[in-house]
Each structure stands twice: as C-alpha cells, then as structure tokens.
Amino acid sequence: MYVSKNMDQWQAFIEILRTAFAQNKEQELLTLLLTPDERDAVGLRLQIVAQLLDKRCSQREIQQNLNTSAATITRGSNMIKTMPPEFMQWVKEQLDGQKE
C-alpha cells in the first residue's frame, strides 16, 4: 500500500490530525491545511468510494453521477484494491451508517 513519499511528514500530519479530533478542532485544522478545491476533492473521493463500495452503479455511471473523469474513478477503485478487506468493510459500515 502506497502511503506517502515522505513518511515523516505524513506521520506529523496524522499526529496533529489525531490531536485536533481529540480537542474538537478538526474543522479548523483541515480548513487551515486544505484549500477549498482540496476539500472538494476529498469530498468527491469519499463519494466515489461510497458508490464503488455500494456496487449498485458501474464506474461509468458513477463518473456521470458525480460529473468527474474516468481517471478519478479509476484512482479511487485502484486505491480500494490496495487496502485490507477488513478496513474496507469498516469504511463501508461507516458510510452506510451516515445514510441512516
């Protein structure tokens, strides 16, 4: 599984993110660190993952539903394939729980 070119920077990000969540400051931290376009891209990736895990639509339909490129859908699909199945099941449960 590919994580980051610079693991020290990635770990520093994860640690400050953990701290922000523990102190209920995640919104402010992510707003500081991510541009509006980057926040939109993260939201889009979450929608892509949700629809891919739902398995109701083809990748082409997801592309059309979300008005994005085939390459963007493929990147999401490829990343899912690199993750442990148990983790992806957990992600699906979290996403399904948000629908309720």
Stretch-by-stretch model annotation:
Residues 90-100:
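Intrinsically disordered, low-complexity basic tails/linkers immediately adjacent to helix-turn-helix/homeobox/MYB/SANT
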Residues 26-45:
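Short, Lys/Arg-enriched anionic-surface-contact patches
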Residues 1-20:
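General nucleic-acid-binding
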Residues 55, 69, 80-81, 94:
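The DNA-recognition helices of helix-turn-helix-type DNA-binding domains
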Residues 78-91:
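Short, solvent-exposed alpha-helical "recognition" segments
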Residues 60-69:
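Short alpha-helical "recognition helix" segments of helix-turn-helix
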Residues 42-57:
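Short, amphipathic alpha-helical "recognition" segments used to contact nucleic acids or chromatin
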